[in-house]
Every structure is written in C-alpha cells, then in structure tokens.
Amino acid sequence: MRALLLFCFVASLLLSGQAEETEDVSEEVPMRDRSHIEKTLMLNEDKPTDDFSAVLQRLRKIYHSSIKPLEQSYKYNELRQHEITDGEITSKPMVLFLGPWSVGKSTMINYLLGLENTRYQLYTGAEPTTSEFTVLMHGPKLKTIEGIVMAADSARSFSPLEKFGQNFLEKLIGIEVPHKLLERVTFVDTPGIIENRKQQERGYPFNDVCQWFIDRADLIFVVFDPTKLDVGLELETLFRQLKGRESQIRIILNKADNLATQMLMRVYGALFWSLAPLINVTEPPRVYVSSFWPQEYKPDTHRELFLREEISLLEDLNQVIENRLENKIAFIRQHAIRVRIHALLVDRYLQTYKDKMTFFSDGELVFKDIVEDPDKFYIFKTILAKTNVSKFDLPNREAYKDFFGINPISSFKLLSQQCSYMGGCFLEKIERAITQELPSLLGSLGLGKNPGALNCDKTGCGETPKNRYKKH
C-alpha cells in the first residue's frame, strides 16, 4: 500500500512538472514585431480622421437629383440587381476575405487588427469555425449587432441584404471594435468554402450573398492554405462570380513558413496551375506569399521575403483607404453610365415597337419579334452611334428578354417624354452628371477645394436644371 502511495505521489510530481514545462514553452513562443503594420497603415499618427462628409454629401446629392430619377423610371435595378443606398455612398471601403475553410482568414484579420489574446478577437481553429458573415466596424466600445438589426438600419450599407431572407440574417453578425484602422475601413469575414457540403444545406443563397459583397468590395483577399489547394465546384463558382473584378482581387498563399523552399515553389506553381482556368485575364491578380499571424516566422525560412510580401499587401490596403473618395466617385459615375445606356436601350426598344405597330398588329407578337432578334431592328447599333457609348459597356442582349418578360414595354415612356417644366429632362441631367458634375467633384479633391464652392455656372450642380420650354 505504501509503495502504491509513493508511486502515485511521484507520478503526480512528474505530470505537474510536464504541465509546467508545457506552460513555459507556450509562454516562450516568440511573437512578431508589429511596427511595420502601424507604420505602413499610418496608425501611429495622431492626426484626426479626415472629414469627407462635405464631399460625400455632395456626391449623394448628385446621385439623388441627376441619376436616380432615370434609374427608377427605367427600372435599372431589375436589370442589374444593384440598388445604391445612401449608406453605400457614405460607407467606408470594404475589404472582403474569401477562401476555403481553415486557411487563416479570421486569424489574418486578428493579426492585422492586433486582436490576438483580447476579448475582441475572432474565434479561430483547425476545424471550420466561421459559419457567419462577420462585419467588423468601428465603434466607441465592443458591441455585437445582430444581422436583423443591421438590415433594418438604413444609415448602414447593409439594408439591401434583407432580400436574402431571415435564415441569412441569422448568419449575419456585426462587431463594433474601437480600433483606429476600422475608422477608415470595414472588414468582412466569410464562411469558409467546404466542397463536400451542398449549397442548399446552408439554408440561404450562399453564392448570391457572396456576389452582393463582391460587387461592393473595394479589395478582395482570396486566401489559400498551401496544404489545401484542391479546386472544387464551390471554388469554381466563386471565381466565376469574381469575373470582371480582377483589379480588386489579391490572392494570398498563407502559412508559407510551414514549407521548405523547394516545396513552397512547387505549391506556388500548383496554385497558378489550379487557378489558370478560372482567371482568364492577360494580367493575373497579385499573389502574396507569407504567414499572416502574430507568431514569429519558423526558423530556416525566407523571413525577409515574407516580410516584404506582407508590407506590399499593407501598402495595397493603405492605397485603397487613401483613394476612398476617388474610388467612390468613379463608382457612382460608372453606375450613371450604365443607367444612361440602359435608358437609351429601353427607349430604342419602345420607339421601334411604336414604329412597327399598326392598327391591325398584334402588339405582343410585334414586340416578341423585336426582343428575340434586336439586331434585325438595329437596336444596339443605333445606341452605339450615340455620343459616349462604348460597345464594351452594352448589356447582354439575353438580359433584356428576361427584363421585358417582367416589365411590359407599355409601362415605359419615351425619353423625350421624361421632361418636366420645373425639373428639366432626366437624360440631360444624367449626362451633365457624367460629363461635368462628377468630374468636377473628382477634380476638387486634388485641388483641395470645398466641394460646396464648385463653379455652378460651369457644372450646373444639379440645382437649377435648364428649362427647355423657356422662350429666348
């Protein structure tokens, strides 16, 4: 009995000694210096956050007075499914994190914000840990906001997400964190892609939700783990959704210090080989190779290369932040160009329909013939002859079959009839916004002018539209 007690005592001492040794080892894990993050993103500067409210208010006014009337009149939202809200106009740049499960998306966000070992940090792990779309925003104190509340708040840019249903809103969460970087940018963490899970099992249209965030993101980080480079159906679908957004995409090969040099080169080549069929552009997106977490790089790895890659990524992020207003104005102008072209096309369809109709004609058959073969009636060629219309901006012809299937042609008016005595003409207002008002607002940023003091004699400013019925 005495021998048994002695054995138990010695065993407990050994186990406690091992536990203390393990604890000491865990405490001795070297952490990486973060000074390059603060320096590159200018987080240590004490200057107050720039106040862009005057420019954004001016931009919002141009949109509502010069663009939205034509957009609503010709139901552009039903063609592109992209409705611009006031919250979207005034929102901060959005950085979207996409990729397979457990590749380090949440860990990367924690690292960039310095949230490790704080009560603010996102939960991370080797298993799929993120099942929600998590939006990290700035706030005076730590606060969690339910998705249903975010969608109901018209001041935020997330109110259109309500259309994806209550099941999705339960998977949407907002977190306000008092962090200086979040004063200038918003991070969005997404559920990892799991190839063996059917989309229907998520309970909401996952791909449609991803497309909504992709369309509004200023920078898109697609993160990969070098040990998991398999490209399945969901990842293929994701890259199809990213078509046309190649300039915003940055591909990240994370956890790079886990591999030896030769293996890292093989993985780098394998990544390009896997993605080549999915990214059909002349200039591929930039690929960053590093390890985005707070622990020191593993020994005998390319530390200098990884650090330079990380700084390059931070410079990319800072560039998006610095060009926030320029990008926002350019986005609204591009939207206005698309709305104008859509209105011209609908007007041309309507004019052709009226020209072909006779007293004995069947209106439904006449218009069906026009929609089925618009080239026969020179619909798109006529629009290309207009001023400032590029063939690369023309929508797909097939899209108008669906559009007019929902919206009868009789529900629209000709552009020549979209004029009022006091308000002027919708087409003239949007053209003035595209050619004068928005470029002038953009130019005022470089000159440091007050946007409220622009020369309204030159730009029109959307305040007093020309009265085309006034006698001279």
UniProtKB/Swiss-Prot annotation:
Major subcellular location class: other
Q: Where is this region: G1 motif?
A: 99-106
Q: Which Gene3D superfamilies match?
A: 1.10.268.20, P-loop containing nucleotide triphosphate hydrolases
Cite a single Pfam family from the UniProt record.
Answer: EHD_N
**UniProt xrefs under InterPro entries:** Dynamin_N, EHD_N, G_DYNAMIN_dom, P-loop_NTPase, TRAFAC_Dynamin-like_GTPase
* Post-translational note: N-glycosylated.
> Where in the cell does this protein reside?
Sarcoplasmic reticulum lumen; Sarcoplasmic reticulum membrane
Q: Which tissues and organs express this gene's product?
A: Detected in skeletal muscle.
Bilayer topology: Peripheral membrane protein
Does the keyword section mention Repeat?
Answer: no
Signal peptide stretch: 1-19
Ranges for domain Dynamin-type G come to 89-330
- Alphabetical keyword list: Glycoprotein, Membrane, Sarcoplasmic reticulum, Signal
Name it: Sarcalumenin
Q: Which organism is it from?
A: Oryctolagus cuniculus (Rabbit)
GO terms of biological process kind: response to muscle activity involved in regulation of muscle adaptation; store-operated calcium entry
